[in-house]
A protein has these predicted regions:
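Mature, Sec-exported extracytoplasmic domains of Gram-positive
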Residues: 1-239
Length: 239
């Protein structure tokens, strides 16, 4: 599916499949025949997912607007339970680069901030997307009081262990308008690596849209026993 939500063919290949299935949610899952131990020493991933059933235009718009820019690695907005009364466990230092990309449409360049992210810039961006005060951010995030900057570190082997879940793609599958003016988005984490699962977890993300088109995240709730399928979160920077 392209950016206009229309099907297209990007390439054609001919290969053997080990197994395949079509899910109720409209995904074609298949596993390629790849070398296996003892022929190779490391597991090769032959799993793939292709969406057959199209998403609605509104689902596509909300997915692109609210969740695709975040994903499930490097920050924990979508993979933890939180609300406006309980925001202390969010990884603010980790989420900054993702919110930066959503706001400015370009990748965060850490070389522009060799000594950390200035307090005003960091706090204003976080407060644009979350109902939180500057004082709370300084309390919850890793803040350099002496230099008045927030620390940032690139994801790497010392602060992140890659997981199949982390590479999952968030997709909005349902949209509910609440009486208080907020909107609850039902989101599924779709993974095409090894486990090949069209909903590793399902969670409800609550947002509030403003008349100017901006929005704030108000809370996230992981449904059923989904929290059991999420690896322990590694904070980008430890105090």
């Amino acid at each position: 599916w392209n950016a206009d939500n229309k099907p297209g063919i990007s390439y054609i290949s001919y290969t053997r499949l080990k197994e395949w299935k079509y899910t109720e949610k409209g995904w074609f899952c298949y596993e390629l025949c790849v070398p296996e131990p003892p022929e190779v020493s490391e597991i090769m991933d032959g799993s793939c997912l292709i969406r057959i059933k199209p998403m609605t235009e509104e689902q596509c718009e909300m997915s692109e607007r609210c969740v695709r820019g975040l994903g499930y690695q490097g920050q924990n907005l979508l993979c933890s339970n939180w609300n406006v009364e309980n925001m202390s466990e969010l990884d603010y230092n980790g989420m900054f680069e993702y919110l930066y990309g959503m706001k400015y449409g370009e990748k965060f360049n850490s070389e522009d901030y060799p000594n950390g992210i200035p307090k005003e810039e960091f706090e204003s961006l976080i407060m644009e997307y979350l109902p939180i005060t500057a004082e709370q951010i300084r309390e919850y995030a890793v803040f350099d009081e002496e230099n008045q900057t927030y620390l940032w570190a690139r994801l790497g082997c010392f602060n992140y262990a890659p997981t199949f879940f982390g590479t999952s793609l968030p997709e909005v599958v349902d949209i509910k308008e609440n009486q208080d003016g907020t909107v609850t988005l039902t989101v599924e984490a779709v993974s095409d690596m090894v486990i090949c699962d069209d909903a590793v977890i399902t969670h409800e993300l609550t947002v509030r849209f403003a008349e100017d088109g901006s929005f704030q995240y108000l809370g996230n709730e992981i449904l059923n026993d989904g929290i059991m399928h999420i690896p322990d979160y590694q904070y980008r920077i430890k105090e």
